[in-house]
Amino acid sequence: MTNGLKKYFNVYVGLSILCWVFLLGIDLYTIHAVIAKIDIFVNDFFIYLLLSLCFLFTFLSFKLHSSKSKNRNFLEQLWQVFIIGAFTIFFSLFIKFFLFLINDTGFSNNIYLVNVLYHVNIGLIVVFVANAFYVWRRMNLYQKSEITHQAWYIFEMLVLLSILTNFFHLEFSSLPFIIISFPLVIYALILSFNLKWVAFLNYSQKWQSILLITLIILISITFVQQIYEQNQTQILVVDLINNTFIMAMFGFICLNSFISLLVLFFNLPTSSVFEQKFGEVMIFQ
């Protein structure tokens, strides 16, 4: 990455962190205003604006990093998704374990502490989905056609535009939520079948990929489960379960991962036979 691009990358990362910090501060003040019955409230617009900007700048930073990466090793790219996923889910589960430990203490009812930890969880989730999205994008665009490239460009724009749904109060089970998220999921499903990279893996690499993708799916499901649990048990200013953008991203990651698993499994026998025949030819020569 050149110095100019690195500067943009650092700016995006810095802005995403700054938006997250301001979002946390405003949410804590909102909670305090409700508890103390203070009449001065921060308009919800600013909360959703900061949340949206945090999402946007995080995604732009990973987009820039992915576009300038020269790594062509597909297995290493899957490792990148897994390692960042493992790192984020470890801290997320640690937060959950910490809340479990203090469950019978006075801290368990501290709404400030709960929301601080929840905002840390938001940051971890955004990092995971942004990294996974752009790694899968890069892999799916391997040996791309012009149509595939345009289709992915449209999908990426639709994904980023879905961030604007933060400004609307959409319930997870509501019809507007389904109407907005359903086309994104269907579009993601169609794009997920462009898996030319699978053919360039040998038998051993395919098994490693199957293991890594399975773990990525488990990480995604664990994050979604935590989002649901926090929605049911905690009082939150920002609730991710009603966030079209985040839930659509998890839908894309799980769909893309599941289809990749199926394709890898179906390609295992052909890889084994090809490598065996290739070995016989080399011995004969």
Regions found by a protein language model. Give the residues of each.
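Hydrophobic alpha-helical transmembrane segments
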Residues: F41-I47, V114-L117, D239-I253
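Short, hydrophobic-rich beta-strand element in sensory/regulatory alpha-beta domains
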Residues: Q285
